[in-house]
UniProtKB/Swiss-Prot annotation:
Native source organism of the sequence: Natronomonas pharaonis (strain ATCC 35678 / DSM 2160 / CIP 103997 / JCM 8858 / NBRC 14720 / NCIMB 2260 / Gabara)
Primary location group: cytoplasm
Protein name stated in the entry: Ribonuclease P protein component 2
Record note on quaternary structure: Consists of a catalytic RNA component and at least 4-5 protein subunits.
GO cellular component terms listed in the entry, alphabetical order: cytoplasm; ribonuclease P complex
InterPro entries in alphabetical order: Pop5/Rpp14/Rnp2-like, Rnp2-like_sf
Annotated function: Part of ribonuclease P, a protein complex that generates mature tRNA molecules by cleaving their 5'-ends.
Family membership: Belongs to the eukaryotic/archaeal RNase P protein component 2 family.
A single GO BP: tRNA 5'-leader removal
Amino acid sequence: MKHLPKHLRPRWRYLAVGLESWPDADIDRRAFQRELWFAAQNLIGDAGSAALDGSVLHFRFEDGDGEAVIRARRGEVDALRAVLATLSTVDGHPLGVVVRGVSGTVRACEEKYIRGPQEGTEERTVAFAGADRPAVVRNDRVTVELSGGPVGATALDIRDN
């Protein structure tokens, strides 16, 4: 089978996406891809999601932080951004999604926008809401365990013990 001439080949753009959730969230590539496709179908329909493509090429998620590289056709980057804005949960875990940048090649996308593994997490006991509570510290973010579930905080909200 012959290759298509260059002017007939599909042109792609690659979005680097940052992911953030609670430290105990377990999100894998398959679940993220499924939620992305469902969100695209719900927002722009079957024909629009087929034109968009939205394939996850690179995925890493651990300890509540992660990143992904998602492929879209050249004219569909804004539609993919809109679809990503509608993602709020994956497998029942809340998820924050931030588009770090757009590039024309996978290599440039990974070199410019994908940072690799974040610094490690640390478990500490902190003073929060008038009591000592267990917490997970990641860079400048703190996740405090309360009886109703985890609560996000910053270094200004807590006091180390």
